[in-house]
Swiss-Prot record:
The gene is UL41. This is Uncharacterized protein UL41. It comes from the Viruses.
Length: 141
């Protein structure tokens, strides 16, 4: 199983423009026997090409990030105060690409910067850390 958690912190850049800084942490289940864990890691890397494509481009996790953005947009009635947190910890599964207002806004009005990710692999543990800065123009609401 693939575990990850995703949450963000809201800050206001200037009137009419604010951003969400998302932090994503993903890791493989470390409870599997070593040999099975290693085989699963190799297969996962082959499927998703982590090193070439980056954290938010491999299948599923990027779509799940969109779900968090969309759920926040649906709940926001006005600009939240700086430091407001969005998202949940301890989500299981990767989710599917959403349709609706959040997905459209993300495609049309939000710029995304991806930061370098860290990968540690000692045969038993697989960690990936990433930051994603999402800038939203307030007029899109």
């Amino acid at each position: 199983m693939y575990h990850h958690c995703c949450y963000g912190i809201i800050t206001t850049l200037r009137p009419g423009l604010w951003c969400v800084l998302f932090f994503v942490h993903a890791r493989h289940d470390t409870l599997l026997p070593h040999r099975q864990q290693h085989r699963r890691l190799r297969r996962h890397e082959r499927l998703h090409r982590h090193d070439r494509r980056g954290l938010f481009r491999f299948r599923g996790l990027y779509s799940h990030l969109l779900l968090h953005v969309e759920s926040f947009l649906r709940a926001a009635k006005d600009l939240p105060p700086p430091g407001y947190r969005v998202g949940r910890r301890g989500d299981h599964g990767l989710g599917k690409a959403p349709d609706g207002v959040g997905y459209r806004l993300l495609k049309e009005a939000i710029k995304i910067w991806e930061f370098p990710c860290l990968r540690l692999h000692d045969g038993r543990l697989f960690l990936r850390l990433g930051l994603c800065l999402v800038v939203i123009r307030a007029r899109t609401f």
